[in-house]
Amino acid sequence: MTATTAESGRPDQPPTAEAGRPVRLTLTRRAGRAPRHLADLTRQERRDVAVSLGQPAFRADQVARHYYARLIAADEPEAMTDLPERDRQPLLDALLPRLLVPVRTLSCDDGLTRKTAWRTVDGASLESVIMRYPDRATVCVSSQAGCGMGCPFCATGQGGLTRNLSTAEIVEQVVHAARVLRRRELAGGETRLSNVVFMGMGEPLANYAAVIAALRRLTAHPPEGLGLSARGLTVSTVGLVPAIRRLAGEGLPVTLAVSLHAPDDVLRNELVPINTRWPVVEVLAAAWEYAEVTGRRVSVEYALIDGVNDDVGRADALADLLVGRLAHVNLIPLNPTGGSSWRASAPAGQRAFVRRLRDRGIVTTVRDTRGREIAAACGQLAAEPAGKPERTDRPEQVGSDRLVEFGAVGSTTPDGDRVLR
């Protein structure tokens, strides 16, 4: 089954391994499609929409400026005072249709972390998470409703894939986060969104066209986009080799995060099933090509699972793969999910793994976990059942403790990882 680009409706060709083996990217499929939205359109396309409504082309640029620069929502037409009142609603209906409906919002970490469960107009479910730190604000976005990669320790993978998200559905998650931060709806006062990580639901590179278009919208300056720095964007992948190589040629110096989780094929075949198509050596070869082309350090994601992949022998094997490379290891103590009996490595085991990598000269970070109490941490996003939408003005507060790994002293990365010194 081919993957469909929601913004165009055209099927993408499924990625293949070098030997020509097709890769199945879906477990389930829903025939849904998002409405056409301003964020799906080029400047000329959106101007054509305005003209088709009998309005001057520049009206579309005004709407885009309100959306990207002023972060005004479609249900706030009264704030768009430069648009004639009689012309506002037709323009908004055509360019800013409703894409995502909030179903539930939860907060933790003293209000510094907020998870929103969304429902699309065709009933698909997804989640995004906003996280505020002392020096930055990050949103973790979904690129698909569900995921077809089938990783057994990940709640999203256990649920299967519903459909790809459109470019606009991805961008809307980011615009919403920027709006929340600007309007002081998160603890800590007003701030600007600085980082976007494609680490929510889905495999971003399996929805390649929509994700690339979203990255371009996020980095373009208003009224074409949000004007974020590409260096503040991170795209995670389980290792779709052809797509990694293609990404290197896009001229977008985003951070590539490779979800490795094991240094050997025997174990990784079990933890990351796509490894049977592209083994570890091929995935890392593509990652090193990406680093060479972009000059960006590759983040190697590694979930520490008690008694599975956390022994020092595997730490040595991982170091052998990475020594001398433009990369760092981001260790993630496994977060609990309902469908898995695995658990995080014990603190002593985590420390031993970190020590072994550091002794080999590998830059190592340990994720400063956010959102575990509200199932918003890495690997926990599974989308709550779509029910009656509710307003998110007063998110439910759950817990307040922030997990600090090992009491380590050091700086943190834009993704919230603690650099151990």
Swiss-Prot record:
EC number: 2.1.1.192
PANTHER family in the cross-refs: 23S RRNA METHYLTRANSFERASE (PTHR30544), RADICAL SAM CORE DOMAIN-CONTAINING PROTEIN (PTHR30544:SF5)
Organism annotation: Frankia casuarinae (strain DSM 45818 / CECT 9043 / HFP020203 / CcI3)
Radical SAM core domain boundaries: 133-372
GO MF annotation terms: 4 iron, 4 sulfur cluster binding; metal ion binding; rRNA (adenine(2503)-C2-)-methyltransferase activity; rRNA binding; tRNA (adenine(37)-C2)-methyltransferase activity; tRNA binding
Family to which the UniProt record says this protein belongs: Belongs to the radical SAM superfamily. RlmN family.
Active site, UniProt feature: 127 (proton acceptor), 378 (s-methylcysteine intermediate)
GO biological process: rRNA base methylation; tRNA methylation
The keyword Transferase is assigned to this record: yes
Function: Specifically methylates position 2 of adenine 2503 in 23S rRNA and position 2 of adenine 37 in tRNAs.
HAMAP family, alphabetized: RNA_methyltr_RlmN (MF_01849)
Biased composition (Basic and acidic residues): 387-396
Name of this chain's protein: Probable dual-specificity RNA methyltransferase RlmN
UniProt cofactor(s): [4Fe-4S] cluster
Ranges in a coiled coil: none
Highest classification ranks of the organism: Bacteria, Bacillati, Actinomycetota, Actinomycetes, Frankiales
Record localization: Cytoplasm
Catalytic activity: adenosine(2503) in 23S rRNA + 2 reduced [2Fe-2S]-[ferredoxin] + 2 S-adenosyl-L-methionine = 2-methyladenosine(2503) in 23S rRNA + 5'-deoxyadenosine + L-methionine + 2 oxidized [2Fe-2S]-[ferredoxin] + S-adenosyl-L-homocysteine; adenosine(37) in tRNA + 2 reduced [2Fe-2S]-[ferredoxin] + 2 S-adenosyl-L-methionine = 2-methyladenosine(37) in tRNA + 5'-deoxyadenosine + L-methionine + 2 oxidized [2Fe-2S]-[ferredoxin] + S-adenosyl-L-homocysteine
GO cellular component: cytoplasm
Alphabetical list of InterPro entries matching this protein: Aldolase_TIM, Methyltransferase_A, RNA_MTrfase_RlmN, rRNA_lsu_MTrfase_RlmN/Cfr, rSAM
Free-text remark on how the cofactor is bound: Binds 1 [4Fe-4S] cluster. The cluster is coordinated with 3 cysteines and an exchangeable S-adenosyl-L-methionine.
Gene name of the record: rlmN
Residues the entry annotates as binding S-adenosyl-L-methionine: 202-203, 236, 259-261, 335
